[in-house]
């Protein structure tokens, strides 16, 4: 097991897995049967991270630091291991809001734009998404723009549409998904907000914090989990405008759905219920607009993150080699 993992990402050819670890980041080789073999660990130049992200060509590993507001850029070696620190930037300043977490920077998520030109660092303490230009040749990141979110909105995560034209920023304090049109103009990133839709659609007066966000592989649906209400909201995505409409809501029968994942088939999702120490799987009926728990809960101590891979059984030749 990986000790105290907060986030993980997988090499695009599914050969290696990278995870947050107490020591910084850790690299693993993925075996044909899904087992993990440790490769190495590396310090990230700051306090413990909370999010990892790879570029599409698996050249660099980017790490976001919640506790110290640091964004780190790590080189990768040919054997899949993590090499030296290429670059690192500490976010500075004070948040504008009254919430305790807004007193200083907290980088909660780092995400490479679909065109691979920029790195988005979501800072829930500053209510910013800082956009860094990536220089792959030199191994450097440089601030290109700042997406300023609403006061005390607490931006937590960012995801991009399958076609790369739209960005979805999940705000955990405001309980919204902010939808942006994304494009590049004169070599500069442009984010135009086109919608802000609530994740607390019933507004029952229960304390609620939006927590997890993912989309289906076909790009037709966006999934959001809410802590407090303990539910998952499914939105339908308009392929032309990127805007969202509520499709269905499911109570997850667990406590604190910190993260979620959508299966590659798009007809199942899993909820990681951190405080009830379990993972629950649900089957989606899009036609009748409901979800049903599809299996018994899997007991996992305080789950933080999950990564879904389409598993292919090893061939007889591969089994003989192993």
Regions found by a protein language model. Name each.
Residues 87-100, 194-204, 300-303, 308:
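Surface-exposed loop and turn segments in beta-propeller and other repeat-based domains
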Residues 12-13, 56-57, 114-115, 162-163, ...:
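Residue-level detector of Asp-centered blade-edge/turn motifs that repeat once per structural unit
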């Amino acid at each position: 097991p990986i000790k105290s993992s907060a986030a993980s990402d997988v090499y695009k050819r599914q050969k290696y897995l990278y995870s947050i670890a107490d020591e910084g980041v850790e690299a693993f080789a993925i075996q044909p049967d899904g087992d993990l073999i440790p490769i190495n660990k590396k310090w990230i130049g700051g306090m413990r991270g909370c999010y990892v992200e790879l570029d599409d060509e698996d050249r660099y590993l980017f790490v976001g630091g919640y506790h110290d507001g640091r964004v780190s850029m790590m080189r990768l070696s040919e054997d899949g291991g993590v090499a030296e620190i290429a670059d690192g930037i500490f976010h500075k300043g004070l948040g504008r809001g009254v919430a305790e977490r807004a007193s200083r920077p907290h980088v909660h998520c780092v995400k490479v734009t679909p065109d691979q030109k920029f790195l988005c660092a979501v800072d829930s303490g500053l209510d910013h998404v800082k956009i860094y230009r990536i220089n792959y040749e030199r191994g450097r990141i440089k601030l290109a723009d700042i997406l300023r979110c609403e006061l005390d909105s607490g931006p937590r995560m960012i995801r991009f549409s399958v076609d790369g034209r739209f960005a979805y920023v999940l705000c955990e304090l405001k309980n919204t998904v902010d939808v942006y049109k994304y494009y590049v103009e004169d070599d500069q990133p442009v984010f135009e907000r086109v919608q802000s839709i609530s994740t607390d659609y019933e507004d029952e007066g229960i304390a609620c914090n939006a927590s997890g966000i993912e989309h289906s592989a076909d790009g037709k649906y966006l999934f959001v989990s809410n802590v407090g209400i303990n539910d998952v909201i499914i939105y339908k995505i308009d392929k032309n405008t990127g805007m969202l409409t509520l499709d269905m809501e499911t109570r997850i029968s667990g406590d604190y759905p910190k993260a979620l994942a959508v299966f590659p088939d798009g007809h199942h999702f899993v909820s990681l219920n951190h405080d009830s120490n379990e993972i629950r799987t649900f089957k989606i009926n899009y036609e009748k607009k409901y979800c049903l728990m599809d299996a018994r809960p899997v007991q996992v101590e305080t789950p933080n993150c999950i990564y879904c891979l389409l598993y292919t059984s090893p061939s007889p030749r591969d089994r003989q080699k192993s």
